[in-house]
Regions:
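Gly/Gly-Pro- and Ser/Thr-rich, intrinsically disordered tail segments characteristic of DNA damage-repair
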Residues: 1-142, 146-148, 162, 200
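DNA-contacting surface of Y-family translesion DNA polymerases
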Residues: 116, 121-209
Length: 209
């Protein structure tokens, strides 16, 4: 579909801009990625300045606005990137991280989906502060391995590195419509279009399902 080709072309432009600064780029979607700029191609010591430059380059080359989150780990950077959408930069500094997380609703946590957020709500866990009252053992019992991550995240701890060579575990496609689709015929037509695009991408990569 032509629209997918446009998305892909713009995505490639954005990813090329990221690569101008660092090879440590871990894509999350067509237009979003983690970047580790601790050491970077520009010799800059400021991640905030790099984020500003990248935003400006994206606008200059694609005429699209972008938001950025700057912090010392992936969890906090992702949360920060959602704060100033669609066209801002938000920084979570190390000495302010725990206070920020304590006030944050758990449904804003990166990695907490709707089902988990609902379960947390049932348990009286509504904010980072509530989550912090739980022991690592109790969180692990309730949420499994993810519970250990939540225990660390709420304390501003995330040791995951930016994985530029991350193994692809899924394949998808998305499309944005100018108007909401209310009619079932339109929805099914859109799903059929997206399914065909996923099939095309899977064949191209010789994936099987």
């Amino acid at each position: 579909a032509p629209r997918f080709d446009v998305y892909r072309s713009v995505s490639n432009q954005i990813m090329q801009i990221f690569q101008e600064y660092t090879s440590l780029v871990e894509p999350l979607s067509l237009d979003e990625a983690f970047l580790d700029v601790t050491v970077n191609n520009k010799g800059s010591r400021s991640a905030t300045l790099i984020a500003k430059e990248i935003k400006q380059k994206i606008f200059n080359r694609t005429h699209l606005t972008a938001s950025a989150g700057v912090s010392y780990n992936k969890f906090l950077a992702k949360i920060a990137s959602d704060v100033k959408k669609p066209n801002g930069i938000f920084i979570i500094e190390p000495d302010k991280a725990e206070d920020f997380i304590e006030k944050l609703p758990v449904n804003k946590f990166f990695g907490v989906g709707k089902v988990t957020a609902k379960r947390m709500d049932e348990l009286g866990i509504k904010t980072g502060y509530d989550l912090k009252q739980w022991s690592e053992l109790d969180l692990a019992r309730e949420f499994g391995k993810a519970g250990i991550s939540y225990y660390n995240f709420v304390r501003g701890i995330d040791d995951r590195e930016v994985e530029s060579e991350r193994v692809r575990k899924s394949l998808g496609a998305e499309v944005t419509f100018l108007d909401d689709l209310d009619e079932i015929v339109d929805i099914l037509g859109a799903l059929d279009q997206i399914a065909h695009e996923v099939h095309r991408r899977a064949e191209k990569r010789k994936f099987m399902a």
